[in-house]
Amino acid sequence: IKIMDILAKLGKVLAHV
């Protein structure tokens, strides 16, 4: 797992909210 992957997931979650 790379930092970019985590940021991408967080970005999607935040965008969903």
Swiss-Prot record:
Quote the tissue specificity entry: Expressed by the venom gland.
Report which superkingdom the organism of origin falls in.
Answer: Eukaryota
Compartments it resides in: Secreted
Which stretches are annotated as coiled coil?
A: none
Q: Which GO terms describe its cellular component?
A: extracellular region
Which residues, if any, are the signal sequence? none
Q: What UniProt keywords apply to this chain's record, in alphabetical order? A: Amidation, G-protein coupled receptor impairing toxin, Mast cell degranulation, Secreted, Toxin
Where in the sequence is Valine amide found?
Answer: 17
Q: Name one GO molecular function term.
A: toxin activity
The record's listing under InterPro entries reads:
Bombolitin
Protein family per UniProt: Belongs to the MCD family. Bombolitin subfamily.
Function, as annotated, reads:
Mast cell degranulating peptide. Its mast cell degranulation activity may be related to the activation of G-protein coupled receptors in mast cells as well as interaction with other proteins located in cell endosomal membranes in the mast cells.
Q: What is this protein called?
A: Bombolitin-3
Source species taxonomy: Eukaryota, Metazoa, Ecdysozoa, Arthropoda, Hexapoda
